[in-house]
């Protein structure tokens, strides 16, 4: 039998634990004080509006719902970004964040000829599994200081500077998983400069936009 997913498998262990004072710190799902997933008011309102429109349900375009894709572009880059106005961004709706990572890595490998990738040390465990499944080798670049209390940016940027061209670099856009420690705006500018100069391919995982 296949082993349990190292992250989602914790949910099964949590549910089997009979202690009343247990706390679930596994999968990042918002729970109320009763330990239940609440129906957020914004979700309830969105569902009400969709129901009241009485629109037919049919197949979406291959790239996803156009209005959703356009909204994502504006959310990520800002509605006034020149690339948004020029219509030069390609956006594809996927089955969740894992699906986006899988599609991005597969596209890079199959159509751009990317063979190597690097992820931060530490990173979300599934990053490595997804990239390997898509045929990429996976290395690591340093991210934390020796006492694991801050980002070791000097070590990180030094490692990025010696990567071979055409390496896929997994970066965490915000709320780094699992540390929560993020780069400053100035550090991001330096990373962008190195990525451009070294001809690297950045893949930015932005699972926690707004945090």
Language-model segments: which ranges?
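Conserved Walker B
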Residues: 206-207
């Amino acid at each position: 039998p296949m082993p349990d997913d190292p992250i989602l498998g914790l949910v099964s262990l949590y549910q089997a634990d009979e202690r009343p004072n247990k706390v679930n710190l596994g999968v990042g799902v918002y729970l109320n004080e009763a330990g239940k997933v609440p129906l957020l008011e914004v979700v309830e309102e969105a569902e009400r509006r969709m129901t009241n429109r009485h629109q037919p349900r049919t197949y979406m375009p291959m790239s996803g719902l156009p209005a959703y894709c356009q909204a994502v572009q504006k959310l990520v880059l800002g509605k006034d970004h020149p690339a948004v106005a020029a219509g030069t961004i390609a956006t594809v709706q996927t089955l969740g964040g894992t699906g986006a990572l899988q599609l991005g890595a597969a596209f890079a490998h199959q159509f751009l000829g990317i063979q190597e990738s690097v992820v931060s040390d530490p990173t979300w465990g599934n990053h490595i599994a997804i990239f390997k499944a898509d045929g990429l080798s996976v290395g690591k670049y340093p991210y934390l200081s020796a006492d694991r209390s801050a980002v070791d940016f000097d070590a990180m940027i030094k490692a990025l500077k010696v990567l071979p061209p055409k390496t896929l670099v997994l970066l965490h856009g915000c709320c780094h998983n699992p540390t929560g420690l993020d780069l400053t705006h100035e550090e991001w500018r330096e990373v962008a400069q190195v990525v451009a100069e070294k001809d690297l391919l950045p893949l930015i995982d932005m699972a926690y936009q707004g945090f």
